[in-house]
Amino acid sequence: MIQQETRLHVADNTGAKELLAIRVLGGSKRRYAGIGDVIVASVKDAIPGGSVKKGDVVKAVVVRTVKERRRADGSYIKFDENAAVILGSGREPKGTRIFGPVGRELRDKRFMRIVSLAPEVI
């Protein structure tokens, strides 16, 4: 579960290393974001020469959460860290590579480019 002020790792090669969630998109009273949900975030740490800089406000999609999520078949999925992928124009990722596994929920929410770039879909 991701909410305001949550810090997330960045799972792509845009140059950002850490994000701070500012807002969960999808309704004025929406408090939590899970895998496949879009958030507005600020870049808190970035490497020099990256496509995003520290302080940039970006949209990102959550790809991994520490909080377990129950699936329709009764199984649960959880990861070791909270991570997100920065989005560019539309729902396409800004980076060209994705690091680490991503949740299968991204396919259901039509983030096909992220699913195809990811090394593993769990």
UniProtKB/Swiss-Prot annotation:
The keyword Ribonucleoprotein applies. PROSITE patterns: RIBOSOMAL_L14. SUPFAM superfamilies: Ribosomal protein L14. GO terms for molecular function: large ribosomal subunit rRNA binding; structural constituent of ribosome. InterPro entries: Ribosomal_uL14, Ribosomal_uL14_bac-type, Ribosomal_uL14_CS, Ribosomal_uL14_sf. Disulfide bonds: none annotated. Keywords: Ribonucleoprotein, Ribosomal protein, RNA-binding, rRNA-binding. GO terms for cellular component: cytosolic large ribosomal subunit. The keyword DNA damage does not apply. Binds to 23S rRNA. Forms part of two intersubunit bridges in the 70S ribosome. Part of the 50S ribosomal subunit. Forms a cluster with proteins L3 and L19. In the 70S ribosome, L14 and L19 interact and together make contacts with the 16S rRNA in bridges B5 and B8. This is Large ribosomal subunit protein uL14. It comes from Bifidobacterium animalis subsp. lactis (strain AD011).
